[in-house]
Amino acid sequence: MKRVFSLFLCLLCVCAVTAQIRGNEIRVVVSPDHSDWVYRLNEKCTFTVRVLKAQNLLSDVKIDYELGPEMYPTEVKKDVVLKDGTLKLQGTMKTAGFLRCKVKAHVDGRTYEGLATSAYAPEQLQPVTKLPADFRDYWAKTLEEARKTPLNPLMTLLPERCTETDNVYQVSFQTKAWGGRFYGILSIPKKEGKYPALLRVPGAGVRPYAGDTYTAPGKVITLEVGIHGIPVTMQQSVYDALAGGALSNYWTFGRDSRDASYYNRVVVGALRAVDFICSLPQYNGKALGVTGSSQGGALSVITAALDSRVTFLAAVHPALCDHEAFFKKRACGWPHYFYYYGAPDEKQLETVRYY
């Protein structure tokens, strides 16, 4: 009984501390003066900066801020003191793009960040990256060559992950070379019938996957894949070791060759995942979607563009976009190859145009 009472007191203390922390939390709020965040070229945008503590403006707070085109600020100031906890900043853009206001507040030895980004004539944005003349031909031939390697799929039931409506498996299949596999988590409705399918492609990183039994339980086949050619049900420590070791910065591997690029095998793997789904007897042969965010958003767009069997697409803030925007000092998509890794040589430029 004493142990139970002691545990109860500990829980009360934790709750009290949590409430106190939340009540005193610091927030940096940056707001543009258009509710839709969209502006005409040359129109002034006024950002209101507020530093709040417990929902009240914090006086005499010190901030740093950057203002200008996304990733290329033209106004940078440090150690600005806000006497009443608020500040108004103005900017504009003469060409289509995004104006960003980024603020860091320094309070009691800690740094808190906030930002807002307004759009200037976003519908007028045009890609800088050039489309190679042989783009589709290259990928058609690459996939044709990959398909000479049979899928040889393997499926292992995961009883602990099965639900009332769906069976869940770890699956793997060959992609472009003997022994080279993609791994993922497959969910198939238990009820006999033909079903639509959804392919989930991942954001950047190295991690395990749980699969998708929640989007439409018992009504859709789902396949959530990893891209690194390793099982997706191992201990987290394995993925952490790989992320910090052999797969650290994997997105830079093979940057000098379209064939050796790390993403060559990844794109082929995503397309072979479509092959695998289409081989399932439970697939209805009519409705196949692909979705993902960031790196997964890019892979969603790529997969849908290169495979006509994909009938619907949902890409969330896709990465790997317009790498050559760097040359016009305009933000490109992650991983911002030339922004972080220096000016490219011609081979690197040729390579990124295929990804």
Regions found by a protein language model. Give the residues of each.
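Alpha/beta-hydrolase fold nucleophile elbow
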Residues: 283-293
